[in-house]
């Protein structure tokens, strides 16, 4: 990703990163609606308009959305909601590995883990699946505060999943992985 961004900058493009809703929110009361297409799309279109307003004539009125993973999904959403940047000309989207088809990802990952004989790889896959699921649940709790992690995860995993409201992907994944290793060794 850094190489791609560097290439865009070298070619003279302005690169703007969205400020996704709920990330870094100081009170901790507003959760990030992880993988909520409209929220992500609005973050991108708002960022594009703000950058153009700030830079004025130093920036073109043409824009493209490019993203990877969650950003890939956000870029697809920006295409859907491009009209929000009404005074600018939307030129297209490049979505790299957008988050999509969760059923396939989760069932495929579980099948892969089930066939894996190497414990490290098995736990790596399962911890990753649990991490994404927990982040999705955290995002769903923003509009649905009565949704409980125990409705999705069994105890004690539900307690780890609650950390999705404050931890980033890597830290949360390590917590799931550590618990899985402890369970495997018991």
Can you annotate each of these PLM segments?
Residues 14, 19-23:
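Short beta-to-alpha linker loops that shape the active-site pocket of alpha/beta-hydrolase fold enzymes
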Residues 4, 40, 44-47, 71-78:
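Stable alpha-helical elements in mature extracytoplasmic
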Residues 1-15:
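Short amphipathic alpha-helix adjacent to the substrate-entry channel of hydrolases
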Residues 50-121:
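Primarily recognizes the serine-hydrolase "nucleophile elbow" in alpha/beta-hydrolase
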Residues 31-39, 65-70:
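Alpha-helix capping and helix-loop boundary segments enriched in small/acidic/polar residues
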Residues 99-186:
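Accessory cap/linker subdomain of secreted extracellular hydrolases
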Residues 22-33, 49, 74:
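Glycine-rich "HGGG/HGxG" loop immediately N-terminal to the catalytic nucleophile
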Residues 33-55:
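Alpha/beta-hydrolase active-site loop
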């Amino acid at each position: 990703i850094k190489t791609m961004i560097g290439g865009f900058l070298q070619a003279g493009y302005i690169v703007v990163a969205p400020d996704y809703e709920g990330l870094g929110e100081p009170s901790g009361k507003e959760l990030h609606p992880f993988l909520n297409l409209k929220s992500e799309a609005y973050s991108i279109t708002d960022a594009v308009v703000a950058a153009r307003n700030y830079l004025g004539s130093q920036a073109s009125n043409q824009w493209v959305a490019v993203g990877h993973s969650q950003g890939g999904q956000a870029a697809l959403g920006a295409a859907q909601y491009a009209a929000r940047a009404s005074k600018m000309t939307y030129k297209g989207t490049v979505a790299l590995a957008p988050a999509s088809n969760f059923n396939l990802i989760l069932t495929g990952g579980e099948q892969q883990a089930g066939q894996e004989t190497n414990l490290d790889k098995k736990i790596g896959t399962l911890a990753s699946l649990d991490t994404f699921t927990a982040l999705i649940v955290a995002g769903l709790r923003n509009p649905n505060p009565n949704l409980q992690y125990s409705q999705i995860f069994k105890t004690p995993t539900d307690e780890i999943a609650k950390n999705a409201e404050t931890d980033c992907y890597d830290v949360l994944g390590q917590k799931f992985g550590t618990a899985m290793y402890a369970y495997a060794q018991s």
